[in-house]
Curated annotation (Swiss-Prot):
Coiled coil: none annotated. It comes from Histophilus somni (strain 2336) (Haemophilus somnus). It comes from the Bacteria. One of its GO terms (biological process) is CTP biosynthetic process. This is Nucleoside diphosphate kinase. Its cofactor is Mg(2+). Keywords: ATP-binding, Cytoplasm, Kinase, Magnesium, Metal-binding, Nucleotide metabolism, Nucleotide-binding, Phosphoprotein, Transferase. CDD domains: NDPk_I (cd04413).
Length: 141
């Protein structure tokens, strides 16, 4: 059994609607172990750095504005096939076509305010986890 780690973010719209506990409960119900977690309010520089790969895309400015609009909760999740399983559980970016039972189907407002983020590959998970957490802050079981 090979455990993977992935980064999850509970985004500003979900934090503002008091959905943190609900989302965390659903993650644990799906077998994810939370091995690191913190709440923070990104500034513009932090948001631009995290989403640097999208800098030249049309939605970049709106994304940065949204991600700095209120606090977020960042988590490191661990389980077998964590990246793929969390991507599936999140649902598609557009909540109008997200599958019933996914986090975005349940909680997302629109494509920008889609409540959660998840790493899209193991390599990106490692980079994204390191962006928010020092090794000493992660309690792998």
């Amino acid at each position: 059994m090979t455990l993977e780690q992935t980064l999850a973010i509970i985004k500003p719209d979900a934090v503002e609607r008091n959905l943190i506990g609900n989302i965390i409960s659903r993650l644990e119900d799906k077998g994810f172990q939370i091995i690191a977690m913190k709440m923070l309010h990104l500034n513009q520089e932090q948001a631009e750095g995290f989403y640097a790969e999208h800098r030249n895309k049309a939605f970049f400015t709106e994304l940065v504005k949204y991600m700095t609009s209120a606090p977020i909760v960042v988590l490191v999740l661990q389980k077998e096939n964590a990246v793929k399983d969390y991507r599936t559980f999140m649902g598609t970016t557009n909540p109008e076509i997200a599958e019933n039972g996914t986090l975005r189907y349940e909680f997302a407002i629109n494509q920008t305010q889609n409540s959660v983020h998840g790493s899209d590959s193991l390599e990106n998970a490692q980079r994204e986890i390191a962006y928010f957490f020092a090794e000493a802050e992660i309690y792998a079981r």
